Amino acid sequence: MKDTSLALHFVSSGTKESLSAQKDLVERYGHVAAEDADIIVALGGDGTMLQALRDFMNTGKPIYGMNRGSVGFLMNEFVIENLPERILAAQMETIRPLVMVAETDDAPPVEALAINEVSLFRQSYQAARIRITIDGKVRLQELVCDGVMVATPAGSTAYNLSAQGPILPLEAPLLALTPVSPFRPRRWGGALLPKHVTVRMDLLETEKRPVNAVADNNEVKSVTSVTVREAPNSQVTILFDKNHSWDERILTEQFRH
C-alpha cells in the first residue's frame, strides 16, 4: 500500500544507483507530475540537486535531496522508510541565486543564473589580470591570478572552499569574493561582500590573457567583463533533515582534519 500523505515528484541523476532508488521510492510513495507535487525529491549527488534547484526555481515547490551520488553536501542521507515524516520535520532554507552578465567582443551579452558561484579562470598559461569594482567603486585595480569567483552561501562549500574561501551559513546576507592562486596582490585572500552589491570584473589585456566565465555549468569563453549580483525575485527552498542541518554540516566541514 502506498503512503500518499504527500504528493511527491522524483527526479534522479540517471545512474544505476539513483534509478534503483527511484523505483523503490515510487513503489512505496507514488509519483505525480511536477506541477501536482507538494515536494520535489532529488536522488543523486550535489550536481543533481543543483539541476533541480535550477529547474524548480520560483515554482514554490521545496526540494528534498537524498544522496545517491559521489558528492552530497546538499543532500540528506538515503533512507527509504518514513520519507513523508522526514520531509515534514525537515528544516527549510531559502536559496537565492546570482545572475551573471558576461560580455565579449563579438557577441551579445550572456545572462545566466548561478546557484553556487560565478567564476572566472584563465584560458592559457598566461595569468589573468582583472580589475574588480564593487557598486561602481574600483576596489582592486589589478588582480593577477589564475581566476576569481563570487560564491553564494550555498556554493561556499564547493569550488570556493577548495580555493580556501570561507564557508558561509545559508542565511548569511553575504557573498564570498575569492581569488584562485593570486600572484598580485600576493597576500590578498578575498573579501566578504554584502549580498546586495554589484560586482564588476573587467578583464585586462584580453587578447594576450584570455579568460572564460562560468555560472555554475554555463560557460562563456573569452569575456571582456562580467557583472554579478543577486538575482532579483528568484528563490527556491531546500529541505534538510533536522539531525543533519546546514549549520551542522558547515561546522563538521570546518573541523574536518
Swiss-Prot record:
Localization (cell): Cytoplasm
Any one GO BP annotation for this protein: NADP biosynthetic process
Primary subcellular site in the record, as a coarse category: cytoplasm
Entry cofactors: a divalent metal cation
Catalytic activities: NAD(+) + ATP = ADP + NADP(+) + H(+)
Binding-site positions, NAD(+): 46-47, 116-117, 146, 154, 157-162, 218
GO CC term (a single one): cytoplasm
UniProt-listed Gene3D superfamilies: Probable inorganic polyphosphate/atp-NAD kinase, domain 1 (3.40.50.10330), Probable inorganic polyphosphate/atp-NAD kinase, domain 2 (2.60.200.30)
One Pfam family recorded for the sequence: NAD_kinase
PANTHER family for this protein: NAD KINASE (PTHR20275:SF0)
UniProt family annotation: Belongs to the NAD kinase family.
Physiological role: Involved in the regulation of the intracellular balance of NAD and NADP, and is a key enzyme in the biosynthesis of NADP. Catalyzes specifically the phosphorylation on 2'-hydroxyl of the adenosine moiety of NAD to yield NADP.
Name under which the protein is recorded: NAD kinase
Gene name of the record: nadK
